[in-house]
A protein has these predicted regions:
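Conserved N-terminal alpha-helix of the aminotransferase class I/II PLP-enzyme fold
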Residues: 31, 35-84, 105-113
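Short conserved active-site loop signatures built around small residues
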Residues: 1-31
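PLP-dependent enzyme catalytic core of the Aspartate aminotransferase-like
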Residues: 111, 121-122, 251, 315, ...
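A generic secondary-structure signal marking the coil-to-beta-strand transition
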Residues: 9, 26-30, 45, 71, ...
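Pocket-edge structural micro-motifs
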Residues: 15-17, 32-36, 51, 76, ...
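Active-site C-terminal subdomain of aminotransferase-like
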Residues: 39, 52-53, 191-299, 303-336, ...
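Conserved PLP-enzyme active-site core in the AAT-like
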Residues: 2-4, 18, 72-268
Length: 372
């Protein structure tokens, strides 16, 4: 049976593990090393210096690559992965199409680092037709689907076709869905980026990033960028990520189920003005989400009546932490407008469903809504 014929939990549990060998551990531990023994030529061994490579990186890169369907390069943060994709690929006169309602750090790189170098930056909403229309002459398109925090969905295959017709490439931020919820490379994307800080690691205790591609030359350039810039992951953190992958399918299944159930429940609450979730049948991009996603992820967006009302709600929660980021086993929520980087209402709440029991989460939210 091929790997892709196996179920998601089986693939996640076995991802990146070495072949069974008598007397060796089932799961390899972290390799803590700066220099490695290297006699003779610089390429006489697979590892020579810790900034260029580490067996623990190799193991987790192999694991993510198996889930993503590509060759993966690990980075010390999601933004390091973003910069490794964007900065070497774009120069004066090139055109970058980037969604305006995705992760604000990406927009910051485009606006503050690429545009001053002569890159033409086109900001567009996460809408398939708008993105396709903006792709004329594009060198690279960057989309995030579902977008964060508004949870809009772009048709990856349609955007890939449009940018490829211009001779460009498509990169997809797949952080929210993870490779078990969506496989952008299979849909035609050239690169799939992950902030492994979030659902991929899932315990809110790591800051890491990864990029998967199918072009070996691009993978080599990503590794060179990582080494030259020092944007590396610590081996212990890389090992923790690999360890966390074994439970990814279980976590994602519970979190996605909780998120959809809460979205349906919140729609019936009189205190809630609006609910956003790609799994809802009346979501404007629901049909696209059903077609290209295997699960809809842990996020729910909903709007309360103003900033003060939203803050009272957050203050009244007991099980749910008020914190940024998302995708962890602990449910979190925040009022996104406090950052000033997202075009959302003052009372918009980004809620990340964790692995708690649904009834307990509903009771916590109900009390905070009623008392706030």
């Amino acid at each position: 049976m091929s790997d892709q014929q196996r179920g998601p939990s089986t693939r996640a549990v076995h991802a990146g593990l070495p072949p069974a060998e008598q007397g060796t551990p089932l799961t390899p531990g972290p390799v803590l090393a700066a220099p490695f023994h290297l006699q003779g030529a610089k390429d006489a061994a697979p590892y020579g210096y810790g900034r260029d490579g580490n067996p623990t990186w190799t193991a987790v890169e192999r694991a993510i690559g198996e889930l993503d369907g590509g060759e993966t390069v690990l980075f010390g943060a999601g933004m390091a992965a973003v910069c490794a994709v964007l900065e070497p690929a774009l120069g004066p006169g090139d055109v970058l199409v980037v969604v305006e309602d995705g992760y604000p750090g990406v927009r910051g790189v485009a606006r503050d680092r690429l545009a001053p170098r002569g890159v033409e930056v086109r900001f567009v909403p996460t809408d398939s037709e708008a993105i396709v229309a903006a792709c004329e002459g594009a060198t690279l398109a960057w989309i995030e689907t579902p977008s964060n925090p508004a949870l809009d969905v772009a048709d990856v295959a349609a955007v890939a076709g449009a940018v490829h017709a211009q001779g460009g490439r498509l990169a997809v931020d797949n952080t929210l869905a993870t490779p078990l919820g969506q496989r952008p490379l299979d849909l035609g994307a050239d690169a799939a980026m992950l902030s492994a800080t979030k659902a991929l690691s899932g315990h809110s205790d790591l800051v890491l990033g990864a990029v998967s591609v199918r072009d070996p030359e691009w993978a080599a350039r990503l590794r060179a960028h990582r080494s030259q810039g020092g944007a590396i992951a610590g081996p212990f953190e890389a090992w923790m990520l690999h360890r966390s992958l074994a439970t990814l399918a279980l976590r994602l299944e519970r979190q996605s189920a909780n998120a959809l159930a809460l979205a349906l429940w919140l729609r019936e609450r009189p205190e809630v003005l609006d609910v956003r979730h790609p799994g809802l049948a009346d979501h404007p991009h629901h049909a696209i989400a059903v077609r290209q996603m295997q699960s809809f992820g842990p996020l729910v967006g909903f709007t309360l009546d103003g900033a003060e009302r939203a803050q009272r709600f957050l203050a009244g929660l007991e099980l749910v932490a008020e914190a940024t980021s998302f995708g962890g086993v602990h449910s979190t929520a925040e009022r996104r407008a406090r950052w000033g980087t997202d075009a959302v209402a003052d009372g918009f709440i980004r809620f990340s469903a964790g692995c708690e029991d649904l009834a307990d989460l509903q009771a916590d939210l109900a009390r905070a809504l009623e008392e706030g």
